């Protein structure tokens, strides 16, 4: 009986560590024990090196929420002084870390932006004439912090678009383009302003009237959801 109680205590202490501190240590502790904490699909990444303190100057971890499957869903922000940043999303249960996601298939977007930045003015004009919206591409790759700021600054316009879309979808999507977004649409009854992405790897803003209608985050669809502000009906989202 005593051994069982001791084991239960040790296991509860282990589970309790799957929190902000544990997620932070994955990226800052060279001796992080992946064999203990990596579960599910993360077992395939035991040989991966997650230590990032030598590559990034700032590492922040915040809890985005939880779901019926995961007790903790975390946002990890890695940033360097040269402006490079990376947003990661970690899915954990009480006994360990089960999945890690980020916005995928961004290589072609990065290449287009890099090519545009070194192009001549004539070439840039040609690309714009072909329909390339470089500001839209930059928004797709923007950090979550920058996207949340963009969303807050334009929330009133988002609401106007929501109203306009009910009356005239074509007119609404013309306004959407002026905001450097891709398009407006309804998906499963929720109004979305899509910034863009490749195939199913999309970033955008979602309007949710009732929190009960908010989709659950998961490694297989909505990899992140974050409200613009405490009383906002708008959420930043990313999918995979």
PLM features: what roles do these ranges have?
Residues 4-12:
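Sec-dependent N-terminal signal peptides
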Residues 17-46, 133-163:
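Core segments of small alpha/beta cavity-forming domains
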Residues 18-22, 69-85, 94-95, 121-123:
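Alpha-helical protein-protein interaction scaffolds
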Residues 40-41, 51, 112-130, 134, ...:
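C-terminal luminal/periplasmic domains and tails of membrane-associated envelope-modifying transferases
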Residues 48-88:
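Surface-exposed, charged secondary-structure patches
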Residues 86-125:
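Short beta-strand edge/turn micro-motifs at domain boundaries
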Residues 140-144, 154, 174-211:
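Mature extracytoplasmic/lumenal regions of exported proteins
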Residues 193-240:
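A cross-kingdom marker for long, charged
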């Amino acid at each position: 009986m005593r051994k069982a109680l001791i084991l239960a205590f040790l296991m509860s202490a282990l589970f309790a560590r799957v929190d902000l501190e544990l997620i932070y240590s994955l990226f800052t502790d060279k001796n992080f024990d992946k064999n203990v904490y990596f579960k599910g699909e993360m077992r395939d990444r035991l040989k991966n090196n997650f230590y990032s303190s030598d590559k990034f100057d700032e590492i922040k971890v915040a809890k985005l929420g939880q779901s019926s499957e995961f007790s903790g869903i975390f946002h990890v922000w890695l940033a360097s002084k040269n402006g490079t940043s990376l947003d990661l999303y970690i899915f954990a249960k009480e006994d360990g870390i089960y999945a890690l996601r980020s916005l995928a298939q961004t290589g072609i977007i990065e290449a287009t932006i890099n090519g545009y930045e070194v192009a001549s003015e004539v070439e840039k004009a040609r690309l714009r004439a072909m329909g390339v919206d470089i500001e839209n591409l930059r928004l797709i790759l923007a950090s979550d912090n920058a996207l949340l700021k963009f969303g807050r600054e334009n929330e009133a316009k988002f609401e106007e678009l929501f109203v306009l879309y009910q009356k005239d979808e074509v007119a609404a999507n013309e306004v959407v383009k002026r905001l450097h977004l891709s398009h407006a649409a309804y998906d499963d009854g929720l109004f979305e302003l899509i910034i863009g992405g490749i195939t199913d790897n999309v970033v955008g803003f979602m309007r949710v009237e009732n929190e009960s209608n908010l989709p659950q985050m998961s490694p297989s669809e909505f990899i992140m959801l974050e409200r613009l502000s405490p009383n906002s009906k708008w959420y930043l989202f990313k999918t995979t």
